[in-house]
Amino acid sequence: MSTSIFVNVPVRDLAAAMAYYKALGFEHNPQFTDETAASIVISDTIYVMLLTHEKFQDFSKKPIPDFNNEIGALYALSRDSREAVDAIAAAALKAGGTEQRDPDDYGFMYSRAIADLDGHVWEYVYMDMAQFPSE
């Protein structure tokens, strides 16, 4: 069995968050979706669990910060090309995401950072290992 990752993030509006991730081209798994949570399928081994604040508090009693003003983590997802990075960034912005900085372009690596509707920052990254510096 492959190792999977489930990234659990608190959201203020579950329906809006689901629509946002659907606009990026991701599907949801109805088997793990109800009125308090939604499973977003990123790949065969990567899932984002969108949890209402109340549901999230079942897992942690720590206060949920305002991710628009604080940050707890950056989540990075690889893409197959620079164009694919720009395409998902454009979809995220159109769906209401917020660009966090200018694109990073190191020649061998290109990335964009977009905050979702709840302020969770996702970096979309393309790496061309053939262009990776040898030293």
Language-model features, listed with the residues they occupy:
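Short, flexible turn/loop "capping" segments at secondary-structure junctions
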Residues: 1, 65-70
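N-terminal beta-strand motif that seeds the catalytic metal site of vicinal oxygen chelate
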Residues: 1-18, 74-77, 128-135
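A generic secondary-structure micro-motif detector
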Residues: 6-7, 26, 78, 105
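Core segments of cupin and vicinal oxygen chelate
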Residues: 8-57
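Residues at or immediately preceding the N-termini of alpha-helices
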Residues: 14, 82-83
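A short, acidic/glycine-rich surface segment
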Residues: 56-63, 132-134
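Short amphipathic alpha-helices within nucleic acid-binding modules
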Residues: 83-89
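Vicinal oxygen chelate
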Residues: 89-135
